[in-house]
Design a protein with these regions (language model features):
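Ligand-binding loop in jelly-roll beta-barrel domains
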Residues: 89-113
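Conserved short histidine dyad/triad with adjacent acidic residue
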Residues: 28-58, 72, 88-92
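A short, N-terminal "cap"/entry segment at the start of jelly-roll beta-barrel domains
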Residues: 1-39
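Glycine- and acidic-residue-biased ligand/ion/polar-headgroup-sensing regions
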Residues: 58-74
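Short glycine/proline-enriched turns and hinge-like loops at secondary-structure junctions
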Residues: 57-59, 77-78, 97-99
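Structural motif
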Residues: 40-42, 64, 101-102
Length: 116
């Protein structure tokens, strides 16, 4: 019995980022894995140049690896290709990419979009 799943991401369609009420057309994503019971999900997200994520709060941890490009967090911290970042439970933030970037994201317990 096969107990693995292989996703050849270069052949997959990245759809507009629709995890929140508002669809972010300048962010694209490819869901890779999700466990509803454990509230755990893994996905790849691509930021177009000059795009940003909405302000959101993490109900659990968020971890991501910068595959390519640069991401700037709302406090000015720059994350570059090869960086691995972990946000603690309860973190509120938004991010921006001037040049575009690709991230491998791991979420625990999801996020809530915040207004302003």
């Amino acid at each position: 019995m096969e107990r693995r799943r292989i996703i050849e991401t270069k052949h997959e369609y990245f759809s507009p980022y629709n995890r929140f009420e508002t669809v972010a057309i300048d962010l694209k994503w490819l869901p890779l894995s999700k466990d509803e019971k454990l509230e755990h999900e893994v996905f790849i997200v691509q930021f177009d140049p000059e795009s940003s994520s909405s302000l959101h709060k993490h109900k659990g941890y968020e971890e991501f690896y910068v595959i390519d490009g640069e991401l700037i967090d709302d406090d000015g911290k720059v994350f570059r290709k090869g960086d691995y970042v972990k946000f603690e439970k309860g973190t509120k933030h938004s991010s921006y990419s001037k040049t575009g970037c690709t991230l491998l994201v791991i979420l625990y317990a999801g996020t809530n979009e915040l207004n302003g």
